[in-house]
Amino acid sequence: MWESHKNDYVNIAKDYCPVLLSGVIRVIVREIQRADHGGAFMFIPSSVQRNDLFRDKRWYSENRLELSQAIHRTLALNSIYRLALKGTWMYPKGVLPTAPDDFPYWVERIVYPQLTNSCIYLTKQCQRIAHLANADGAVVLNTSFGLEAFSAKLNSDIPTLPADLASFLGSKGNRHNSMANAISALPGSIGVVVSQDGSAVCFHRLSEGDIEFIDLTL
C-alpha cells in the first residue's frame, strides 16, 4: 500500500510544507507580540560556521528536536488524512498503530483527532520558542527547526550593508542592527525581529550574497 501511494503522500507533504512552516513562523511572531516585550529568533544552516557570531549564548548540550519532530508529525498526519478523505488507507510505519476495520470510523475518530492533537502540540512548541525569544538575546535554530541556543548575544561588527538596508536600520535599535549584521554574514540564514510595538521584520541572506528585509504583516 505504501509503495502504491508513496508519490501521492510525498506530493501532498510538499504542497503543505510551505503553508505549515509559514504558519509556524506566524505563531511564534504572534506569541512574541502578545508578550509586549519584543524578541528575536534566527535560522542558521547547520553547515554554516558560526563560532564568531555570538559573544554570549546558552547552548543546549544537543539540539532540542521537539519543534522539528512536531512539524514532521503534522506533515505526515496531514498527508494521511488527505489521502484518507479520498478513500486511500496508508501510513508510514510508526505514525499510526493499526490497520482500520471500519474505514470511515478510522478517518473520523482516529486520524482526524491525531492530526488535531498534533497541531495543538506544534502550537505549544511554537509558544515555547516565543517564550525563549522574550529573553534578552536571540533564539537560535537550524534550518531543520532544531533548537540550538537561546539568549544569544550577537556580535555587532558592522559590515558593509546595502544602502536601503543601512537607511532602514538607521531608525532601528540594537536588536535590529545586530540581527541584520549577523544574517548578512551567514549565507542561507534567516532572522526575525519583533519590536515592543509589535512590528516584525524578517532578514534573509540570499545564496547569491544579497540580503533582503521584509516587513511581516500577520
Each model region followed by its residue ranges:
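Divalent-cation
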Residues: 1-218
